[in-house]
């Protein structure tokens, strides 16, 4: 239970960083492999 409690306490920060990482990875994949890359990835 102690491990679960510690994980529950650590999740907010880890989730926010995890979302940023996965978001950037997804955007890179979309830019590389999607036909919408011109629309989504142009500055």
From Swiss-Prot:
Belongs to the lanthionine-containing morphogen protein family. This is Lanthionine-containing peptide SapB. It comes from the Bacteria. The modification 2,3-didehydroalanine (Ser) is found at residues 27, 37. Maturation involves the enzymatic conversion of Ser into dehydrated AA and the formation of thioether bonds with cysteine. This is followed by membrane translocation and cleavage of the modified precursor. InterPro entries: RamS. The gene is ramS. There is a cross-link at residues 24-31, 34-41 (Lanthionine (Ser-Cys)). Residues 1-21 form the signal peptide. The keyword Ion transport does not apply. Pfam families: RamS (PF19402). Lanthionine-containing peptide devoid of antibiotic properties, involved in the formation of aerial mycelium. Suggested to self-assemble at air-water interfaces, thus providing a film of surfactant through which nascent aerial hyphae can emerge. The aerial hyphae differentiate further into spores. Keywords: Signal, Thioether bond. The lineage of its organism: Bacteria, Bacillati, Actinomycetota, Actinomycetes, Kitasatosporales.
């Amino acid at each position: 239970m102690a491990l679960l409690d510690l994980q529950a306490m650590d999740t907010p920060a880890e989730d926010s960083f995890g979302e940023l990482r996965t978001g950037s990875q997804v955007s890179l994949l979309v830019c590389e492999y999607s036909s919408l890359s011109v629309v989504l990835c142009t500055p």
